[in-house]
């Protein structure tokens, strides 16, 4: 993605250093987002993005499981949401993976997803913030790592919800 200039870059650091890095960053990324003077700020933003994706994966898992239990075409559903309310790589790409149960090769593994959920929990604790859905996400990701596959794409967390709805993929 860097060679294609398609990365989303979160930059942080001393303004002079960030300014000096901008020409290189702009070549690698389609957009550079500045997050202040500390690397911790950019890290927190990245953790928050991945925490949001974890929520999206679980929402997709639940919606697709509901459709499967109702006998509907999940591929058409994913195409519809990607064309209307949720265009983009998260709902479109991961939605398709979940609908097709295509979790290899992984772009980001379930074990890395669990790590990022826990990083969000730790960051929230440090900031005094509450993440009410975090215990559910943690449990789903822990189950995915131990019972579905630690090295599968993190979209495979959908199989936890499917399994609990008696739609096993094994």
Question: Model-found features: residue ranges?
Answer:
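Hydrophobic alpha-helical segments
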Residues: 19, 165-170
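Rossmann-fold dinucleotide-binding core
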Residues: 1-51
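Secondary-structure boundary/capping signal
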Residues: 29-32, 131, 169
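Helical "substrate-binding/catalytic lid" subdomain
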Residues: 41-164
């Amino acid at each position: 993605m860097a060679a294609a200039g398609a990365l989303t870059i979160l930059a942080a650091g001393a303004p002079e250093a960030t300014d000096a890095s901008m020409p290189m960053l702009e070549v690698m990324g389609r957009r550079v987002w500045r997050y202040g003077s500390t690397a911790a700020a950019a890290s927190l933003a990245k953790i928050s993005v991945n925490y949001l994706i974890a929520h999206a994966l679980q929402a997709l898992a639940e919606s697709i499981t509901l459709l499967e239990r109702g006998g509907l075409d999940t591929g058409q559903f994913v195409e519809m949401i990607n064309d209307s309310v949720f265009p983009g790589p998260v709902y479109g790409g991961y939605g398709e993976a979940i609908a097709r149960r295509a979790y290899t090769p992984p772009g980001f593994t379930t074990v890395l997803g669990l790590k990022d959920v826990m990083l969000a929990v730790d960051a929230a604790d440090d900031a005094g913030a509450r993440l009410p859905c975090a215990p559910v996400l943690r449990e789903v990701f822990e189950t995915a790592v131990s019972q579905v596959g630690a090295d599968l794409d993190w979209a495979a967390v959908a199989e936890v919800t499917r399994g609990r709805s008696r739609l096993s993929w094994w």
